[in-house]
Amino acid sequence: MSKTGGSDSKNTLYCSFCGKSQHEVRKLIAGPTVFICDECVELCMDIIREESKSSLVKSRDGIPTPKEIRKVLDDYVIGQDHAKKVLSVAVHNHYKRLNHATKHGDVELAKSNIMLIGPTGSGKTLLAQTLARILDVPFTMADATTLTEAGYVGEDVENIILKLLQAADYNVERAQRGIVYIDEIDKISRKSDNPSITRDVSGEGVQQALLKIMEGTVASVPPQGGRKHPQQEFLQVDTTNILFICGGAFAGLDKIISSRSKGGTSIGFGAKVAPVEERRPGELFREVEPEDLLKYGLIPEFIGRLPVLATLNDLDEAALKQILAEPKNALVKQYQRLFEMENVDLTIHEEALGAIARKAIERKTGARGLRSIMEGILLDTMFDLPGLEGVEEVVISKEVVEQNARPLYIYADRVGDAGASA
């Protein structure tokens, strides 16, 4: 860190690009007659990354290879190697199919929508968001729990297409090549195995409504959203080439898979029964079959529209520690950047990262719960820090996470804990 003192303004050095002084930045790098600060270096790196990403998308007639897709996914998503491989191939084939359709009319290639099955906080949403970013296509997310059949209180299925159109700045052609991610898809499972005589408007009814847009139809979308009115002019959007990715935690599906796999085992005193607890849900999900999803409550036609199944594993302590520190947008890096804005270094010990990961596992929230744990740990520090002078570094140890101890504050001239400086 380049922090030189001295009150003489003549000796103060400035960044040649943003004009900040050496006292306002962490590092000032000297070149022949010019200086550049660490913030401008980061900005340049971001610009280069974006340009290299766009050149990746433009290569090979606009379709990145599965290996190229996987490489970018690795930068943002830790672990889940099987799911990343399945998604990379499926997405590559989908956009290759679109290019094929415009050039060859002899063989029609069917669309392969994707089902993501994995525990809460395992990275389903992040995978879908990252895919859209790689391919530079419009992307929208929908929550299946808010959807109802047309004519009932709730959100129409066709509103999903409206959101995609908005993401494409109302460019219909771009929207027709976009990606839709529908979360909590397991929550619209049929309420019982047997079809009911009463209308299931938020379960089977939504599955039926989604079928039409997933297989390909021309949706009439009201430009300003909401319910349709006879006087409105509608935008016509063909959903044939829109890639649908559905994700869900499918709580209890592991038990259905386990009971099926043990269906042929013997009974009695000599029977060897492996307890379900020996295998985690993520491991069992790898063995999922369409019949398991049918038993869970998805209708056969809906399962048929999602031929590509990608399963995600539970995240263990090692994976959660990696998620905290390693990706380009890792949580630790985000909080370090926030502290940098106060000219303070944030140091989190390796043991503290492990303690944070264990807390997330105990809460059964996966990676999704990491931010709330970090917020709780750093809340008092972030509240006090703007009003403190002379703090150069804040150190988070394992005791801060596990025993609610106070973080260590390192001042320019002394060391003290948060309590001593409050």
UniProtKB/Swiss-Prot annotation:
ATP binds at residues 119-126. InterPro entries: AAA+_ATPase, ATP-dep_Clp_protease_ClpX, ATPase_AAA_core, Clp_ATPase_C, Clp_protease_ATP-bd_su_ClpX, ClpX_bact, P-loop_NTPase, Znf_CppX_C4. It holds the Pfam family AAA_2. One of its GO terms (molecular function) is ATP hydrolysis activity. The keyword Nucleotide-binding applies. Keywords: ATP-binding, Chaperone, Metal-binding, Nucleotide-binding, Zinc. GO terms for cellular component: HslUV protease complex. Zn(2+) binds at residues 15, 18, 37, 40. GO terms for biological process: cell division; proteolysis involved in protein catabolic process. The keyword Chaperone applies. Residues 3-56 form the ClpX-type ZB domain. Belongs to the ClpX chaperone family. ATP-dependent specificity component of the Clp protease. It directs the protease to specific substrates. Can perform chaperone functions in the absence of ClpP. Component of the ClpX-ClpP complex. Forms a hexameric ring that, in the presence of ATP, binds to fourteen ClpP subunits assembled into a disk-like structure with a central cavity, resembling the structure of eukaryotic proteasomes. This is ATP-dependent Clp protease ATP-binding subunit ClpX. It comes from Azorhizobium caulinodans (strain ATCC 43989 / DSM 5975 / JCM 20966 / LMG 6465 / NBRC 14845 / NCIMB 13405 / ORS 571). The gene is clpX.
